[in-house]
Amino acid sequence: MKLATITFFLLTEIFFYISYAEATRSGPDLCPTIISKRDWGGNAALRVGYTSKPLERVVIHHTVTPECANEARCSSRMVSMQNYHMDELGYDDISYNFVIGGDGRVYEGVGWHKKGSHSPGWDSQSIGIAFIGDFTNKLPSREMLDAAKDLIVCAIELGELTRGYKLLGARNVKATKSPGDKLYREIQNWEGFTRRP
């Protein structure tokens, strides 16, 4: 009887350990690699606003800035973007939660469960994902598109986004041409797409 009890408790502990590790892991199996704000050279936010989680919306943007093809260039674009958003537009930080670089990497903007400045009226209810470049007349690379899709799956698995989320283009929530005509047509085929917030 003692051996059976010890075995039961040991197996229970192993089960809970594996379940906890599975629920808290973040890495290539669960999320795409995310280049942290510190790693791309970003400044700290002036103020941080938090969102409740899980959120129910993802808003897709394009930056209409020059593209980038490697981590050094994309990091430079991120620094320039953050400086413009803070110094010229008066935002507290870079406006997006995450940004997809031309190198197929995800760059941290304000990050998880923090309020961006990407979609007035919807910032506290959505994750803003921007693609570096102008996607009016061409699509982002397959690597960029896959990185964004992987990030959305990651958000769901981490509990940052509901499974029944709505995916919108920036033009669906404000007066803009973002995320560009070609990219907007593309995201209409993605899971969760809707024109109504």
From Swiss-Prot:
GO term, biological process aspect, one = innate immune response
Where does this protein chiefly localize? Answer: secreted
What keywords is this UniProt entry annotated with? Answer: Disulfide bond, Immunity, Innate immunity, Secreted, Signal
Q: Where is the signal peptide, in residue numbers?
A: 1-23
- A GO term, aspect molecular function: peptidoglycan binding
Where expressed (tissue)? Localizes to plasma (at protein level).
* CDD domains for this protein: PGRP
| InterPro entries membership | Amidase/PGRP_sf (IPR036505), Amidase_domain (IPR002502), Peptidoglycan_recognition (IPR017331), PGRP (IPR015510), PGRP_domain_met/bac (IPR006619)
Q: Which GO terms describe its cellular component?
A: extracellular region
Q: Which residues form a coiled coil?
A: none
Residue ranges of every copy of the N-acetylmuramoyl-L-alanine amidase domain listed in the record: 53-180
Q: Which cysteines are joined by disulfide bonds?
A: 31-154, 68-74
Family listed: Belongs to the N-acetylmuramoyl-L-alanine amidase 2 family.
- Protein known as: Peptidoglycan-recognition protein 1
**Originating species:** Holotrichia diomphalia (Korean black chafer)
Gene name as annotated: PGRP-1
